[in-house]
Amino acid sequence: MSVGIIGAGQLAYALARGFTAAGIVSAHKIIASSPEMNLPTVSALRKMGVNLTRSNKETVKHSDVLFLAVKPHIIPFILDEIGADVQARHIVVSCAAGVTISSVEKKLMAFQPAPKVIRCMTNTPVVVREGATVYAMGTHALVEDGQLLEQLMSSVGFCTEVEEDLIDAVTGLSGSGPAYAFMALDALADGGVKMGLPRRLAVRLGAQALLGAAKMLLDSEQHPCQLKDNVCSPGGATIHALHFLESGGFRSLLINAVEASCIRTRELQSMADQEKISPAALKKTLLDRVKLESPTVSTLTPSSPGKLLTRSLALGGKKD
């Protein structure tokens, strides 16, 4: 099995790093494409031994499972570009927020009658094999296609199948969730520094507290509120701290954050369905389209980071 990733940003790096760390796909069986070859993530992928190219078509050609790991506004252009190269063997996995299965299928069905499409929402902790992933099956995707994707994503964290109409809510919760956690951790560390702790120690203690709390919850059958109560001694420091959080609307802020992310995802979906994008996204789309339509299709191989080659990548004929 070979894996292609269109896009070479943070998600692409996280997926490649997770898959190789899990041993489910070797680096030489992964190919990623990007119009920009000077990105930090591209350098990191190159160091891992991942095959790199500027050509999205080449990525399709040398993959069985194809991840679309680009921003939602660029998906239509990507599909127009690669549609003729997608074959019956390909499983096309869209990771773009708000991009529906039907919109991807509609584009690809201009080139073939039954494209196998799966919509996926994951998050960046797949890089340390602690990701949270859900997926929904497209009209023509087979049971074994879903099983293959679940095998891949389960190797880098939690993975389960859901109905597509739940994915927007998942985006608001676990898709955006790591950012909430990082912001909370940064604030906790600031609190520690305010009280006299060195920054490095404050960050480490805060991160360990969040990690330990998450593991306690996942390893038990207790409700989060019960675990919270277990930390609170009558009249103690923790219950006073929780009272302060409650008075500041801590719970409501988190609930509203999940809702805001979900609503924005639905707005992106509506804009995509109507083929409308924001002015800022339009400007970026035009720039990206120029890069996509560039005649240069040279390949950067991991073994020669400074040398451009025009030959095809040899990813091996045998399937894992």
Swiss-Prot record:
Record bears the keyword Amino-acid biosynthesis: yes
SUPFAM superfamilies: 6-phosphogluconate dehydrogenase C-terminal domain-like, NAD(P)-binding Rossmann-fold domains
Composition bias, Low complexity: 295-305
Binding site for L-proline: E164, A237, T238
Positions of NADPH binding: A8, Q10, L11, S34, E36, N56, V70, K71, A97, N230
Annotated residues for binding of NADP(+): 6-11, 34, 56, 69-72, 95-97
Keywords, ordered alphabetically: Acetylation, Amino-acid biosynthesis, Cytoplasm, Mitochondrion, NADP, Oxidoreductase, Phosphoprotein, Proline biosynthesis
GO cellular component terms attached to this protein's record: mitochondrion
Subcellular location, principal: cytoplasm
Subcellular location: Cytoplasm; Mitochondrion
Residue list for modification N-acetylserine: S2
First-tier enzyme category under EC: oxidoreductase
Pfam families: F420_oxidored, P5CR_dimer
Keyword Oxidoreductase: yes
Pathway: Amino-acid biosynthesis; L-proline biosynthesis; L-proline from L-glutamate 5-semialdehyde: step 1/1
Phosphoserine: residues carrying this PTM: S304
InterPro entries: 6-PGluconate_DH-like_C_sf, NAD(P)-bd_dom_sf, P5C_Rdtase_cat_N, P5CR-like_CS, P5CR_dimer, Pyrroline-COOH_reductase
Top-level lineage group: Eukaryota
GO terms for MF: pyrroline-5-carboxylate reductase activity
Subunit structure, interactors included: Homodecamer; composed of 5 homodimers. Interacts with LTO1.
Family indicated by similarity: Belongs to the pyrroline-5-carboxylate reductase family.
Function, as annotated: Oxidoreductase that catalyzes the last step in proline biosynthesis, which corresponds to the reduction of pyrroline-5-carboxylate to L-proline using NAD(P)H. At physiologic concentrations, has higher specific activity in the presence of NADH. Involved in cellular response to oxidative stress. In some cell types, such as erythrocytes, its primary function may be the generation of NADP(+).
Protein name, UniProt field: Pyrroline-5-carboxylate reductase 2
Phylogenetic lineage: Eukaryota, Metazoa, Chordata, Craniata, Vertebrata
